Amino acid sequence: MSLKVDIQKSFGDFRLDVAFEAGNETLALLGASGCGKTMTLKMIAGVEKPDAGVIELDGVTLFDSEKKINLTPQQRHVGLMFQNYALFENMTVYRNILMGVREDRRSAGAKEEVEAVMDCLHITELADRHPSQISGGQQQRVALARIMVSHPNILMLDEPFSALDEHLRFKLETVVQDAIEDFGKTVLWVSHNRDEVYRRADRMAILDDGHLDAIGTVDEVFRDPRTPKAAALTGCKNILPAECVDETHLRLSDHDIVLAVKPYPGALQQAGETAVQLKPAAISHVGIRMHHIRPVTDMSDPNQLLCIVTGETRNPFSYVLDLAPAASADRPFAMMEIEKDLWEKTRSEELLITIDPADILLLRDK
């Protein structure tokens, strides 16, 4: 299966304009609330209508504004699981799932098909219960089972774990992942959780304010998120204004600190265009992940900087330190994550840190 999307829609001052393709893979759409993720899924499903553009699925045109094509949701055979699961409270779990079987397939084999999907998702024992009698995680699996028995041409999950606690979320991710692998077609997975995306997606696209900032494999996007907002969505806590000194050095504008950096690779495809080499002058910010700031262990380490520790936050297995340059201690610089045992053994007011040039994210404004 293959999905091609190039659509636009305006809502007052907000404009959604996205273009991407997906094959037999899990493509995650990562973005903050209100960026257009859910609306994108709704337009693919036919629940909402784009103002303009084209949507194709496996060579079939689902929507084309110029050709006046707009298939109904039923004609599109798309599986969309909403955040609230939308189960029928007056029906048992079994009946809820049976409702997903298309009318032209409701034959003698429908019962066996429903039972097989229930077994796959480990909900067989819930068959005679009603949605109000089962947990949120169980409701989620029922909703997914109802979609799977409809044999959709594409599966779209809208933040499927957002209402679940961390322990249950991780457990159910594995169950859903097994179902996705059995599905074997295109899956769109909307999320604002970067860890969830990293664990489960093959590729990811970062959506910000209605536009795609970057799209690529999960490792590519985390390694080179391209823009400050995209870097923040991948979990980067230190994003600092910077200006070019030369092709391998940048100055942090707020601190007058010069850092050695790697040449910009320009490795990712940006929405709708082929990536090109980014000139150093286009770089507006740098991103430094907390765990990439380390204590100096060798005086030959690059990008050394003496810092004052202005605060610390204890986590179960680490500390997050607030750092400021010793030369300007009143101006916060960055946050650093350090192993709990190491910091408790070496805690001090000053810390000499190092940052590998290869770990510095080179970012640009849109």
Enumerate the predicted regions with their spans.
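ABC ATPase NBD Q-loop/coupling interface
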Residues: 54-76
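ABC ATPase nucleotide-binding domain helices that frame the ATP-binding cleft
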Residues: 38-41, 142
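ABC ATPase nucleotide-binding domains
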Residues: 77-79, 87, 92-229
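C-terminal boundary and immediately downstream tail of ABC-type ATPase nucleotide-binding domains
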Residues: 223-249, 287
